[in-house]
C-alpha cells in the first residue's frame, strides 16, 4: 500500500551487499557531503576523522553524496568538494570519485539513487508494525510542538502521535485521496 512499486526485500539487498571481508577491527567510514556549495572547515574536519580512522585500521573510506535536497544543489559542487579533499591528501577508496562518477561494489553512492533500497527497508518496518505513515501537515506538527513546549512535554507519542494508530482503511483512504505522508518509527516503549 505505501510502497507498491517496491518488490525487493531487505534480504535481497543484504545478499547484494554482503558484509565486507576485512580484517577484524577494520573500520568502514564515510564522508557524506551535500552538494550545496564548497568544502568548508566542518566538512574537512569530519572527513579527516573518517579518513584517518579507516586508514589506521586498514579499513575502507568512501564518499556518498547526500543529493536529496535538489532545491539547494549547486552545479559543480561535488567536483569542487572532491578537489578540495585531494588538496589535503584525501582520496576515497570507493564511492563518488567525480561528478556522476562512482567506483566500488556497494554502488550507488548518490543518496537519491538508493531510494529503492531505503524504501524496501521502510516497507519491511511497516509490515512488521515498527513504522507507520503520518499525514500531519507541517502546520499541525508546529501546533503540536507548541502545545508540548507549553506543557514541557518532549517527544512525539501518545495523544500527540495522531496517526500512530490509524486503521488500514483510514490509511488507504488518505493515500488514495493524495494526502502527503512521512514515515515515523513506531516505538513499543
Model-predicted regions and their roles:
Residues 1-149:
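N-terminal Rossmann-like or analogous alpha/beta NTP/dinucleotide-binding catalytic cores
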Residues 124, 131-189:
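Active-site cores that bind ATP or allylic diphosphates and position pyrophosphate for catalysis
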Amino acid at each position: 500500500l505505501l510502497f507498491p512499486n517496491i518488490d525487493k526485500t531487505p534480504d535481497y539487498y543484504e545478499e547484494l551487499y554482503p558484509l565486507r571481508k576485512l580484517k577484524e577491527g577494520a573500520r568502514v567510514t564515510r564522508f557524506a557531503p551535500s552538494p550545496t556549495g564548497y568544502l568548508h572547515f566542518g566538512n574537512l574536519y569530519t572527513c579527516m576523522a573518517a579518513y584517518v580512522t579507516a586508514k589506521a585500521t586498514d579499513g575502507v573510506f568512501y564518499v556518498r553524496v547526500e543529493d536529496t535536497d535538489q532545491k539547494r544543489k549547486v552545479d559543480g559542487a561535488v567536483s569542487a568538494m572532491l578537489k578540495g579533499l585531494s588538496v589535503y591528501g584525501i582520496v576515497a577508496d570507493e564511492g563518488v570519485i567525480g561528478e556522476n562518477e562512482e567506483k566500488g561494489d556497494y554502488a550507488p553512492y548518490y543518496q537519491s539513487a538508493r531510494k529503492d533500497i531505503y524504501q524496501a527497508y521502510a516497507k519491511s518496518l511497516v509490515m512488521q508494525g515498527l513504522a507507520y505513515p503520518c499525514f500531519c501537515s507541517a502546520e499541525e506538527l508546529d501546533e503540536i510542538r507548541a502545545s508540548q513546549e507549553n506543557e514541557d512535554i518532549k517527544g512525539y507519542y501518545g495523544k500527540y502521535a495522531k496517526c500512530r494508530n490509524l486503521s488500514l482503511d483510514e490509511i488507504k483512504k488518505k493515500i488514495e485521496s493524495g494526502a502527503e505522508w512521512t514515515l515515523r518509527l513506531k516505538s513499543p516503549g
